[in-house]
């Protein structure tokens, strides 16, 4: 089984200094691939997060120096985002629990699709599992996952998972949560 990488989502109610403290601890503890940041803090966090080796994705805003943008799924939104980032950047699209929106986003040029994995299904098959079995574009299991949720989520084969938002409490909590996730992922 391929181990999914970690996709962090920064809250909009913390300072850049606080976020960077948690982010640095998280990167030291596990395989963090990327961080989705609110447009309001993108300018301050992009360069330091990229220095940690992360792809920085701006939620709904212009990419600036970030690696990409994240939009709500929909052909027009994805197409506009694709134009904004050009060929060098990437576009992610949140499709929630909608197979239709996810497929539209993929067809419009999204580089990844974020899905709401809890309870969402297609013909009784969990939506993340369905996506992973029929599509090549990477999938982010977008709802935060706790350790106990991994047993249900991992067989669905997401490419990326979002850790618990509790990780943003402080650097120690971030390190603990990411370490526990990494250890559990490595034993699966």
Task: Go through each PLM region and give its residues.
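Flexible glycine-rich beta->alpha loop in the catalytic core of nucleotide-sugar glycosyltransferases
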Residues: 118-119, 159, 166
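Generic beta-sheet signal
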Residues: 59, 94, 115-116, 142, ...
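Conserved catalytic cores of soluble enzyme domains
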Residues: 86, 116, 123-135
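Catalytic-face loop-and-helix region of soluble metabolic enzyme cores
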Residues: 129-144, 161
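Active-site phosphate/pyrophosphate- and oxyanion-stabilizing loops and adjacent acidic/basic residues
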Residues: 79, 129, 151
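Charged helix-capping and loop-helix junction motifs
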Residues: 20-21, 122-129, 177
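Conserved N-terminal beta1-alpha1 strand-loop-helix module at the mouth
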Residues: 1-75, 83-98, 102-110, 136-137, ...
């Amino acid at each position: 089984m391929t181990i999914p990488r970690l996709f962090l989502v920064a809250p909009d109610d913390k300072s850049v200094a606080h976020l960077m403290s948690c982010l640095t601890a998280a990167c030291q503890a596990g395989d963090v691939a990327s961080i989705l940041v609110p447009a309001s803090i993108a300018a301050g966090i992009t360069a330091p997060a990229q220095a940690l080796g992360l792809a920085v994705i701006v939620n709904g805003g212009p990419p600036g120096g970030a690696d990409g943008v994240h939009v709500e799924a929909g052909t027009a939104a994805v197409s506009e985002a694709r134009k904004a980032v050009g060929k060098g950047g990437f576009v992610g699209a949140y499709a929630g629990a909608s197979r239709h929106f996810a497929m539209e986003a993929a067809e419009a040029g999204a580089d990844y699709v974020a899905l709401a994995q809890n309870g969402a299904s297609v013909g009784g098959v969990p939506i993340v599992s369905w996506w992973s079995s029929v599509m090549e574009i990477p999938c982010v299991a977008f709802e935060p996952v706790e350790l106990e949720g991994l047993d249900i989520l991992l067989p669905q084969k997401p490419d990326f998972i979002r850790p618990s938002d509790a990780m943003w409490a402080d650097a120690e909590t971030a390190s603990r949560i990411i370490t526990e996730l990494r250890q559990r992922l490595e034993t699966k």
